Amino acid sequence: MRTVFFGTAEIACPVLRTLSEMPEVNLLGVVSQPDRPKGRKLVLQPTPIKALAARLSLPCHQPPNIRRCEATLGWLEALDLDVIVVMAYGQLLASSVLEMPRRGCVNVHTSLLPKYRGAAPIQWAIWNGDAQSGVSLMQMDEGMDTGPIIATQSIPIEATTTAALLHDHLGELG
């Protein structure tokens, strides 16, 4: 299956790693947010996904705005994709991108949708004292985590569970 992965944050690395190991997936490249300055000295750092893509010898595009980057859009179009997999990318995809792959775009989201759409679902689950959280796989549409849910997998949240611990568990679960 001809596939491109969209992601930026560390939490998405296990999903990219898993896709790269699946024999039925022909992983053709990665799209990530641009590198950003970090630390006191504001040294430009690659995103965790870009760093992993380099270790996996995958090309990585980093458009500031995926909706307006003709080079990245042309590259994606030329790949004749079956699917785009997205996790923690940080930009909404335009309908032109959503319609490129034959089987559409799927998003891995760290909440039990429809609860906690958008940013910070892990923190909201902890803040609200939820008894469980999980990961949802959804078919993407133009909204923020609003497409049809394909599958979910839940895990309990214990009284001692921190946001950092839940983050790590959900990243692996994805």
What role is predicted for each listed range?
Residues 1-174:
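One-carbon transfer enzymes
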